[in-house]
Amino acid sequence: MHSRGREIVVLLNPWSINEAVSSYCTYFIKQDSKSFGIMVSWKGIYFILTLFWGSFFGSIFMLSPFLPLMFVNPSWYRWINNRLVATWLTLPVALLETMFGVKVIITGDAFVPGERSVIIMNHRTRMDWMFLWNCLMRYSYLRLEKICLKASLKGVPGFGWAMQAAAYIFIHRKWKDDKSHFEDMIDYFCDIHEPLQLLIFPEGTDLTENSKSRSNAFAEKNGLQKYEYVLHPRTTGFTFVVDRLREGKNLDAVHDITVAYPHNIPQSEKHLLQGDFPREIHFHVHRYPIDTLPTSKEDLQLWCHKRWEEKEERLRSFYQGEKNFYFTGQSVIPPCKSELRVLVVKLLSILYWTLFSPAMCLLIYLYSLVKWYFIITIVIFVLQERIFGGLEIIELACYRLLHKQPHLNSKKNE
C-alpha cells in the first residue's frame, strides 16, 4: 500500500492530549515556518507525535516497572528490556510502510538470523539508523540491535529514556572519553552472554556539503581519494569494537551495509516533519564471517578503508545508473520471515500503540495512584540521568556490585 501520489491532509488522534499537543505544535511550527520557509505536513506531525507518545508512555508504564530487577539480576533485566523495547521499534517500521508507502529493497548477502555481529553502514542521512529497522525486522531480530549514539540524546524525554533502558552506547565523539565506556559496555554484554548486533557509523556524521568538504580536505591533506557519495571513515572505534567483541567470543560476523535513496533523500528530522518520507530505501548487504577478517589493528583499519572505497564505486553506479543494486549481480535476499508475518506484526503494532497511549492517559486521569506513579517515575528518570549519568550506567554498576567486579575490563587489562 503506497501513498506516493497522495497527500494525507489530516490524521486525527483519538485522545485529547495528543490533539492539544498537535494544536500547539501546529501553531508554533506555522509561526516558525513563516520565518524560515518550512512547510509542515500533518502526516509528519502525526508520525513524530505517535513515536514520541509511544516512547514516553512506554518508558513509564512498560520499562520502569522492571527497573527494580536491575538491582537483583541485571542479565534478566537486560533480557526482558530488549524485548520490550523491540515492541516499540516495530512502530516506525509499521508507520513508514503501511501508512506512508515507503518501499524497502534489500540485496546482497543473507543474514544469519540471531547471529552476533557488528553492522557498519554509510551515513547518508540523520535517520539511517531508524530506516535500518525496516531491514532488520525482516532479516534479523530487532531485540538484538544496539546503536552508538550522541550522548546528548539520552536526556530527551521518552526517546532518551527508552534508549537508556535499551543499553544503547552513548558517546561524546572524543575517543579519550569514549574508550572506557565502550570497554565497559562491550565487556558487560560479553559477560552476560547477551547477543547483539551493534550498529556503527564509521563516518561519524551524515553526508552533507559541509561534512563532505571536511572529508575531502582531510583526503587532500593525506593524499587520499576524494569521495562524492561517502565520507572517509574513522576506524579507531570500529577496530576497537571488533577486537573487543572477538576477545569476548561474542562476534560471528561483520555486516557491511550500503544504504541508498533513489528518489527523495530526507536528510534530517525536519524533512520527516514536513512529511518528506523516502519513497524507496535500498540496502545492499555484505556479510563477512569473523574468521575472514584481519587480526591486527592496522590490517583491520585498511580493511575498513577498502570497504569504503567499494561503497563509493557502488553508490556511484547506483546513482548514475538505474538506481538499484542489481548491477552487483546479486538479487533481492529472501527474508527469514514471511511478508504475511511481517504484515501481521505491523498491523498489531499500529493497533497496540494507538490504543496504549490513550489508555495510559485515561488511567492517569481516573486514578490518583496512577497519577502519582506517573509523576514519580518522570522525576526518577530525570534525576537518575543527571546524578548517575543514565540507566545503562546504573545497570553496569549493579552488575559490578553483584559480581564484585570493580571494573568489567580489569581481567583484560591485567
Swiss-Prot record:
Q: What membrane topology is annotated for this entry? A: Multi-pass membrane protein
EC number, as in UniProt: 2.3.1.-, 2.3.1.51
- The EC category is transferase
Q: GO CC terms for this protein? A: cytosol; endomembrane system; endoplasmic reticulum; endoplasmic reticulum membrane; membrane
- Where is the chain membrane-spanning? 47-67, 86-106, 340-360, 362-382
Alphabetical UniProt keywords: Acetylation, Acyltransferase, Developmental protein, Endoplasmic reticulum, Lipid biosynthesis, Lipid metabolism, Membrane, Phospholipid biosynthesis, Phospholipid metabolism, Transferase, Transmembrane, Transmembrane helix
Q: Name where it's found.
A: Endoplasmic reticulum membrane
Cross-referenced PANTHER family? 1-ACYLGLYCEROL-3-PHOSPHATE ACYLTRANSFERASE-RELATED, LYSOCARDIOLIPIN ACYLTRANSFERASE 1
Q: Which organism is it from?
A: Homo sapiens (Human)
**Protein name in the entry:** Lysocardiolipin acyltransferase 1
